[in-house]
Amino acid sequence: MSLHTFFVAPTGFGVGLTSTSLGLIRALERTGLKVHFLKPIAQPHPGDDGPERSSELISRTLGLSPPPAMPLAQVEHQLAMGELDEVLEEIVSRYQQAADGADVVVVEGMVPTRQSNYAAQI
């Protein structure tokens, strides 16, 4: 079987993106598929201090071990320095880690905000 990827994109902030990802993973697993998860770039809530929420929830709930998300501050710095290609290369590298041994990878996108208007570009 060839590898398939589902990109879960939000329509706005607080729309239940991680819940959707979790439900999609469980539904796919019930069909017998080996499903892995990737949140390429962390998007912390104000006041968050600790692991990226989506990956942590998926890990604790489903026992998966997704690659760590890139810290948002690092991504913003690299983009400000004109290093879009480097950011994209790192995302591809983390995707390849997530895809290892999987039939399906569920990739959770970023919520576009006024502060992260680059989210659609990535």
Question: What are the language-model segments listed below?
Answer:
Residues 3-11, 15-101:
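N-terminal phosphate/diphosphate-binding loop that engages ATP/GTP or pyrophosphate donors
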Residues 9, 107-109:
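Conserved beta-strand segments of the P-loop GTPase G domain that flank and frequently precede/overlap
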Residues 101-107:
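Loop/turn-to-beta-strand initiation segments
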Residues 110-122:
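Conserved catalytic-core segment of NTP-binding enzymes
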